[in-house]
């Protein structure tokens, strides 16, 4: 609040001393994609019916740049720009879009234009404060030939558009057409930057006299700057929020089976599975019958390996005995035959 109080005091002193020259002012827009805390106070304290002194504008711009929260610092000079040019609503399609998406944005309808190039001081300060080593300068037709870059080094970009034509009806192209063309060129420049994190100062270093000496009745883009959300500061572009990770929805290859409670007493179930039920019943009855027969039938001796060996040994003895008896009987028969032959 001390900064705002000192700024208001300097503004009053400048008005009293008559240091603000009527007609030598230009509108100015300042915005940053990331939040620059403390900047919004100047917007709330500003009165658009007064002219903002050049030193105060310079101090506000320096405070905005001191945050060093951007990958590119763009200084746009539109020679001949005046407050009434923002009444051409059809000419401005890009600038309002960038302003509405920015976390910090300021508008000053009337800023005293310093005799010296205010950009020089701001650019030198940015290079030193934010350690920016590279600078790109685009003049007039070069603004339509901006080549994109893909490295991560911060840059200062100066954009100097060609002066705006007069207000005559016979002017070709018209003032509105030139504003619309420059608006699209700015879109191509900002759209080709590798990061949306930019800080932009848009004004005129060569102002034109206002069409009316009366104080402005409407501010620049009131639908943006007079929105209730602009009364508080918050980060509008925080991409590191706790966002739920994406999981694809489940798409089964087969349709889910309907949940149907089956019952043995269901007539449809019995009719469609009659053969299977009969087979189950026959198997169950047969198994029960076998169990009952095994339970009540006389028990037979169970053969063991040892009993089997004894039985085999006894069988061998019987075979040998039978063989011996047969041999003995054969010998006896042989003796009887031989005796009969002798008697004959």
UniProtKB/Swiss-Prot annotation:
Function: Required for normal beta-1,6-glucan synthesis.
One Gene Ontology term, aspect cellular component: endoplasmic reticulum membrane
GO BP term (any one): vacuolar proton-transporting V-type ATPase complex assembly
Signal peptide as annotated in the record: 1-18
Protein name per Swiss-Prot or TrEMBL: Protein BIG1
UniProt keyword Cell wall biogenesis/degradation present: yes
Topological domains annotated Cytoplasmic: 297-344
């Amino acid at each position: 609040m001390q900064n705002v109080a000192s700024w208001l005091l300097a503004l009053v002193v400048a008005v009293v001393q008559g240091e603000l020259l009527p007609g030598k002012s230009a509108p100015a827009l300042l915005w940053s994609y990331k939040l620059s805390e403390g900047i919004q106070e100047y917007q709330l304290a500003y009165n658009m019916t007064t002219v903002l002194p050049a030193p105060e504008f310079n101090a506000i711009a320096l405070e905005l740049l001191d945050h060093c929260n951007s990958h590119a610092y763009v200084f746009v000079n539109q020679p001949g720009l005046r407050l009434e040019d923002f009444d051409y609503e059809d000419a401005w399609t890009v600038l309002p879009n960038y302003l509405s998406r920015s976390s910090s944005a300021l508008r000053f309808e009337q800023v005293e234009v310093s005799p010296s190039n205010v950009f020089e001081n701001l650019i030198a300060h940015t290079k030193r404060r934010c350690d920016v080593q590279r600078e790109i300068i685009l003049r007039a037709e070069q603004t339509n030939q901006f080549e994109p870059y893909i490295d991560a080094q911060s840059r200062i970009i100066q954009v100097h558009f060609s002066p705006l034509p007069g207000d005559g009806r016979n002017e070709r192209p018209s003032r509105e057409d030139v504003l619309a063309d420059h608006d699209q060129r700015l879109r191509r420049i900002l759209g080709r930057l590798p990061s949306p994190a930019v800080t932009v100062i848009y004004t005129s270093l060569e102002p034109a006299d206002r069409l009316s000496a009366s104080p402005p009745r409407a501010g620049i883009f009131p639908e943006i700057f007079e929105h209730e959300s602009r009364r508080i500061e918050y980060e509008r572009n925080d991409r590191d929020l706790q966002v739920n990770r994406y999981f694809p929805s489940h798409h089964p290859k087969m349709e889910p089976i309907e949940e149907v409670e089956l019952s043995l007493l269901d007539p449809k179930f019995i009719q469609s599975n009659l053969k299977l039920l009969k087979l189950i019943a026959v198997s169950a009855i047969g198994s029960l019958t076998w169990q009952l027969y095994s339970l009540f039938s006389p028990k037979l001796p169970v053969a063991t390996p040892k009993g089997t060996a004894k039985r085999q040994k006894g069988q061998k003895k019987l075979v040998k005995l039978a063989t011996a008896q047969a041999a003995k009987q054969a010998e006896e028969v042989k003796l009887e035959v031989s005796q009969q032959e002798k008697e004959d």
